[in-house]
């Protein structure tokens, strides 16, 4: 997969703080790789951000894209004819009860008795599903991801017009994808979402 960074991505990276450049280019490189596999005609399309910061393929609103990184973990998603969101999260070493109550709501009592490590892991899995949903919706944190009901241990669910999937059987690092249940108004041929 190792390829030179896309010239458009390098230009954007040049304006970023130095500490963010490598992370940004790694995320874009993985996204470009997935685009080459799924929508090859869009692999070199410039990427811009909408008013809320969501990445978009310039001139192609019918192909949803999403990028997430946390430390060295990177995840991307592409959806032909769909809005998509992806989130990857390294578990926190310490999770206060107040954060569990905030993000898990009525399910917090199921996680509070767990070991500190398991609390962090389970919260990370739940948070990735919540965050993937609001990324797909294009609202980010203003969409109150913590209010999305994701029961601990869940592998899939639905929130509004979005379906989410936690890749618990495929990833050791908490990673979830969300995608719209309805099509973008476009000429896209069918619905197809890929998460990596």
PLM regions with names:
Residues 1-196:
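Core catalytic alpha/beta fold that binds nucleotide/phospho-ligands
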């Amino acid at each position: 997969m190792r390829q030179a960074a896309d010239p458009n991505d390098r230009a954007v990276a040049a304006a970023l703080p130095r500490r963010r450049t490598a992370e940004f280019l790694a995320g874009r490189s993985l996204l470009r790789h997935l685009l080459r596999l799924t929508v090859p005609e869009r692999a070199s399309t410039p990427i811009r951000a909408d008013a809320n910061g969501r990445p978009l393929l310039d001139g192609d609103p019918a192909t949803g894209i999403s990028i997430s990184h946390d430390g060295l973990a990177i995840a991307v998603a592409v959806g032909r004819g769909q809005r998509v969101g992806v989130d990857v999260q390294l578990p926190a070493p310490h999770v206060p009860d107040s954060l569990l109550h905030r993000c898990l709501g009525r399910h917090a009592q199921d996680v509070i008795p767990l070991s500190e490590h398991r609390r962090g892991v389970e919260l990370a899995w739940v948070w990735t599903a919540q965050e993937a949903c609001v990324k797909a919706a294009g609202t980010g944190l203003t969409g109150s991801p913590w209010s999305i009901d994701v029961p601990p241990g869940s592998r899939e669910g639905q929130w509004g017009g979005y379906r989410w999937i936690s890749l618990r059987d495929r990833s050791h690092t908490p990673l979830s994808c969300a995608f719209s249940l309805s099509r973008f108004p476009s000429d896209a041929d069918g619905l197809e979402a890929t998460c990596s």
